């Protein structure tokens, strides 16, 4: 038997004893040595970790692989490297593998309802390997209880806003609407403060452009941001349009975009899954 095979079976045997504290004899080239396997120190069993996290940093999770966390007193040296300013040491962290506008609308509502501030918004290239983004958002506040409340509220609202995300094998569509844009939507999409806000993203990108064109022709609205794979995104396969204006006009634009977007996406061969309940 090869040495590598011997070591493989030896390690398997050691692993079975790793939580027993028993002694075993390990063969050497010149005889044997006797060693005691330290109980619990040799191999970690990740299934010993509960799925119900009790860490103080943990706030919760929700749909779209979203997690909410807090840090009550961020390390000073790390804070200086984060490029978010040094005003706040109590931070809220909100991060998802899939989706952007739904979570950002939830964060926007949460910040408006609490004594917290948006410090940074990033849209990583993710969507678990699909065509779009995930999100990584940092909040700050003077009181960790305010920050925790904002993150908890955003987690709850994400379940609502996930209702306008449509994901199929062929692509995805995302829509959002807010009657009054706040600081998160202003920072991410240059929304007009206090005005109605609308958002649409389509993947493949060609569907997104047709949706954007349909929205602009449907009602009198103002473009606040326009993004493509090479412009404003992390090279996602999307065209993204956000709008501001009168509430009824913005909603009409988004609804018209949704209708044509769904027809085009379904024409590619499969019906989309919806991780929530449509709310528009």
Mark where each language-model region is:
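Short, conserved beta-strand segments within well-ordered enzyme catalytic domains
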Residues: 138
């Amino acid at each position: 038997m090869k040495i590598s095979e011997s070591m493989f079976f030896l390690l398997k045997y050691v692993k079975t004893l790793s939580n027993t504290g028993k002694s075993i004899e390990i063969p050497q080239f010149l005889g044997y040595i006797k060693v005691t396997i330290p109980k619990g120190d040799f191999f970690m069993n990740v299934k010993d970790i509960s799925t119900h996290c009790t860490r103080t940093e943990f706030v919760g999770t929700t749909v779209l692989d979203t997690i909410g966390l807090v840090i009550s007193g961020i390390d000073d040296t790390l804070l200086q490297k984060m490029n978010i300013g040094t005003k706040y040491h109590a931070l809220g962290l909100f991060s998802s593998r899939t989706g952007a506008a739904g979570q950002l609308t939830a964060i926007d509502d949460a910040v408006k309802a609490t004594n917290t501030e948006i410090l940074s918004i990033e849209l990583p290239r993710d969507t678990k390997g699909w065509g779009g983004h995930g999100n990584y958002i940092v909040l700050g506040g003077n009181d960790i209880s305010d920050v925790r409340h904002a993150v908890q509220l955003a987690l709850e609202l994400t379940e609502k806003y996930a209702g306008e995300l449509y994901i199929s094998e062929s692509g995805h569509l995302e829509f959002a609407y807010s009657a009054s844009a706040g600081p998160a939507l202003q920072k991410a999409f240059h929304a007009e403060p206090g005005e109605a806000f609308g958002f649409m993203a389509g993947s493949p990108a060609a569907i997104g452009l047709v949706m954007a064109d349909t929205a602009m022709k449907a009602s009198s609205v103002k473009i606040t941001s326009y993004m493509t794979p090479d412009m404003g995104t992390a090279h996602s396969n999307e065209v993204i349009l956000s709008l501001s204006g009168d509430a009824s006009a913005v909603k009409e634009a988004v609804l018209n975009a949704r209708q044509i977007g769904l027809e085009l996406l379904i024409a590619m061969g499969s019906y989309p899954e919806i991780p929530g309940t449509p709310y528009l």
